[in-house]
């Protein structure tokens, strides 16, 4: 079984908990998620099954969309409402000032990841160090906030939708907004509404998954989130060359290579998605596709 499940992770479960449920349901070991959601957050969590685990990096690289609630006037050690309160301050900013501060983060900005995160430094996850009372210096990361829509501002609460790049911590965004306003802030609610091409309206709950007799009925194809990529469709006569990882020349293809040098493409054998390649150029200016990753072994 190979494909992707769009799971609605409930609050109270870790992303790995969801993977464990799917493994048990399918009686398969080759199962993985595509981007950690905080245990207390809910939302879209694509789960890769079988050979689809080999494309998880492409899903990790995709944009994410969230609905979040920011509570101003509080600072905690975890940057969310569940952490130990470090400081409380009065919120004196007007709704217009709050709106301006929130929207000022649209674009690229440098974030310092929270200590309570799964990032590894020298082989140790930061949250493991944080639980031991150890805090270490973290390097800034450039993240991109593509869009923010403010849904409501009510006293110290701000509800907003945000579209952002991979690796963006919404907890840290909330903390940073609070710092700009001079009163501190924490994330008090988080729902991931989209991850790459997977959205909330097509996600299934754990309960719905457990009730299914045939999971393959809802399994999405491996290339479902890759529709934005160009396709290189290889003629069946050249299947051996592809599965051996050899170069793919234009005459191997149903159509010629139109893509520019350096562009990654999805490689198909007729209708079957078999891997990824990148367009390269030989010394005599003949384009070819170099195989980057095969999803299936040669039989």
Swiss-Prot record:
It catalyses: uridine(55) in tRNA = pseudouridine(55) in tRNA. Its EC number is 5.4.99.25. It is an enzyme of class 5 (isomerase). SUPFAM superfamilies: Pseudouridine synthase. It holds the Pfam family TruB_C_2. It comes from the Bacteria. Disulfide bonds: none annotated. GO terms for molecular function: RNA binding; tRNA pseudouridine(55) synthase activity. Transmembrane segments: none annotated. The keyword Magnesium does not apply. InterPro entries: PsdUridine_synth_cat_dom_sf, PsdUridine_synth_N, tRNA_psdUridine_synth_TruB, TruB_C. The active site is at 38 (nucleophile). Keywords: Isomerase, tRNA processing. GO terms for biological process: mRNA pseudouridine synthesis; tRNA pseudouridine synthesis. Responsible for synthesis of pseudouridine from uracil-55 in the psi GC loop of transfer RNAs. Belongs to the pseudouridine synthase TruB family. Type 1 subfamily. NCBIfam families: TruB. This is tRNA pseudouridine synthase B. The gene is truB.
């Amino acid at each position: 079984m190979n494909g992707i499940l769009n799971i609605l992770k409930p609050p109270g479960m870790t992303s790995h908990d969801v993977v464990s449920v799917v493994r048990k349901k399918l009686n398969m070991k080759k199962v993985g998620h595509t981007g950690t959601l905080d245990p207390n957050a809910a939302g879209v969590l694509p789960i890769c099954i079988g050979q689809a685990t080999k494309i998880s990096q492409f899903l990790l690289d995709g944009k994410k969309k969230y609905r979040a609630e920011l509570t101003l006037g509080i600072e905690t050690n975890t940057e969310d409402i569940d952490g130990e309160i470090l400081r409380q301050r009065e919120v004196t900013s007007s709704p217009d000032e709050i709106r301006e501060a929130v929207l000022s983060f649209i674009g690229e900005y440098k974030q310092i990841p929270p200590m309570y995160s799964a990032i590894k430094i020298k082989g140790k996850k930061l949250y493991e160090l944080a639980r031991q009372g150890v805090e270490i210096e973290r390097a800034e990361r450039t993240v991109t906030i593509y869009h923010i829509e403010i849904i409501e501002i009510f006293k110290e609460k701000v509800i907003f939708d945000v579209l952002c790049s991979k690796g963006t911590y919404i907890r840290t965004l909330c903390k940073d907004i609070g710092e700009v306003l001079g009163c501190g802030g924490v994330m008090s609610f988080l729902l991931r509404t989209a991850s790459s091409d997977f959205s909330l309206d097509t996600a299934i709950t754990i309960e719905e998954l457990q009730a299914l007799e045939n999971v393959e009925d809802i399994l999405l194809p491996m290339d479902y989130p890759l529709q934005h990529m160009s396709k290189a469709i290889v003629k069946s006569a050249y299947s051996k060359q592809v599965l051996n990882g050899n170069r793919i020349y234009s005459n191997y293809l149903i159509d010629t290579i139109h893509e520019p040098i350096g562009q990654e493409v999805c490689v198909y054998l007729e209708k079957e998605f078999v891997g990824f390649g990148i367009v390269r150029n030989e010394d005599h200016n003949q384009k070819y596709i170099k195989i980057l990753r095969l999803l299936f072994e040669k039989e």
